Amino acid sequence: SYCENESYTKLKNKIIMKNAKYSINANLVYKNGYSGKNVNIAVLDTGVFKHKQLDGCIKHFMDFVGGKETCYDDNGHGTHVCGILSADIGMAPGAGLYVFKVLDYLGMGQTSDSIRALKYIKENCVRLNIKILNFSVGYLPCSDTAERIKILKLIDELWDMGVVVVAAAGNYGPSPFSVTVPGISRKIITVGSFDDIRSGKGPTDCCIVKPEILAPGHDIISLGTRDGTYV
């Protein structure tokens, strides 16, 4: 739900994000002069709303679900993720965002749309100077094997090209072997949640230890899909 008092929400958001940053030692990175400036991130998700906190951050938007040309997010998850990444109080403030909508208003999507987006990124990552790929999408390992192999192949190829690929462990835990695709790739960085029992658990079916990193994943306040709103 949306908070009506924007100033209060900003303060609460700042406190929560500060605690999240502290828990993963992000401040050590900031002290060495690093931020999100001059770093471009590709985000595969539900899209993005042009929130004022993302002014100047959204470099490009492509809609593989509805074919629209202007930015939108009919679910909210993509905007929430983009806020965590690039908003003023985000983890990498000022990072450039290349947003690819591959999930619909229910947060569901076709593997074929993710494959098309990944192919586009592979063909254009050098030209667009994309350094990081945030893959919020998670497909069950038991899903279509041929499509799964295509996604993993593209993900691994992007990693070999120098793109740091970060994927969620998924929300099908806490049973073993519940990490989703492409988080099961042996090459990429898979992130799980240390405060959500549903977070995917390893190992993978190839006996790879996953996830590599745990971070806060529950009740994180970020940007909403209306200006001045936070969720």
PLM features: what roles do these ranges have?
Residues 1-31:
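Autoinhibitory propeptides
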Residues 30-60, 68-112, 126-131, 160, ...:
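Subtilisin-like serine protease catalytic core
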Residues 36, 102-187, 205-208, 222-231:
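Substrate-binding/access-modulating region of protease and related hydrolase catalytic domains
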Residues 45, 56, 183-231:
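Extracellular S/T/G-rich loop segment that most often corresponds to the catalytic His/Ser-adjacent loop
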Residues 49, 87, 120-126, 193, ...:
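Glycine-rich, acidic and aromatic/proline-enriched surface loops and short helix-turn segments
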Residues 49, 64-65, 90-91, 103, ...:
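Active-site/binding-pocket entry motifs
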Residues 65-74, 225-231:
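Short pre-catalytic strand/loop immediately N-terminal to key active-site residues, enriched for Gly-Thr
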Residues 96, 164, 219:
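Residue-level detector of anion-binding/catalytic polar loops
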